[in-house]
């Protein structure tokens, strides 16, 4: 089975494709990035301009095509601090879903920290 994980941040979108083996171990099979510097486009009203929403959707669509081309079975997408910061994050989430069928989960601070901790433990073989 292959899965893709997309991290949607304020400066870049990253996608890593993993192959999950029967023993539930996994191996990276590709990494793709799109630098967008979205954080600098937040208006004084804490909204991402419509033009940047469209560009973000285009970027995620590109990553989705890469995932499909790699034979990915499932895509997981996560919005982090940037999504918590902007007032129109649900508009961005909805537009990404409409265009790609990908559901973006906006992580709260605790969930984001836990995922980072677990990833670090896995990377360094800690239990």
Model-assigned labels for residue ranges:
Residues 64-94:
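Short beta-strand-loop/turn "lid" adjacent to the catalytic site in phosphate-handling enzymes
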Residues 20-24, 92-100, 122-126:
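A glycine- and small-aliphatic-rich helix-loop capping segment at beta-alpha/alpha-beta transitions
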Residues 101-107:
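A glycine-rich helix N-cap at a beta->alpha junction
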Residues 54-66:
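Short, well-ordered amphipathic alpha-helical segments that serve as non-catalytic structural scaffolds
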Residues 13-50:
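Short glycine-rich, Thr/Ser-proximal phosphate-binding strand/loop in the N-terminal lobe
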Residues 1, 107-127:
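Conserved phosphate-binding catalytic cores of ATP/NTP-utilizing and phosphoryl-transfer enzymes
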Residues 3-7:
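Short glycine-aspartate micro-motif
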Residues 10:
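Short, glycine/acidic-enriched loop or turn micro-motifs at the edges of active sites
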């Amino acid at each position: 089975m292959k899965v893709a994980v997309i991290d949607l941040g304020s400066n870049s979108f990253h996608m890593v494709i993993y192959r999950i083996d029967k023993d539930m171990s996994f191996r990276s099979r590709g990494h793709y990035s799109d630098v967008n510097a979205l954080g600098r486009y937040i208006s004084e009203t804490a909204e991402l301009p419509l033009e940047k929403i469209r560009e973000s959707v285009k970027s995620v669509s590109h990553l989705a095509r890469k995932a499909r081309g790699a034979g990915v079975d499932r895509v997981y997408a996560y919005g982090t601090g940037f999504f918590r910061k902007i007032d129109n994050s649900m508009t961005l989430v909805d537009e990404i879903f409409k265009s790609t069928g990908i559901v973006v989960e906006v992580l709260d601070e605790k969930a984001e920290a836990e995922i980072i901790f677990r990833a670090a433990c896995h990377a360094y073989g800690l239990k």
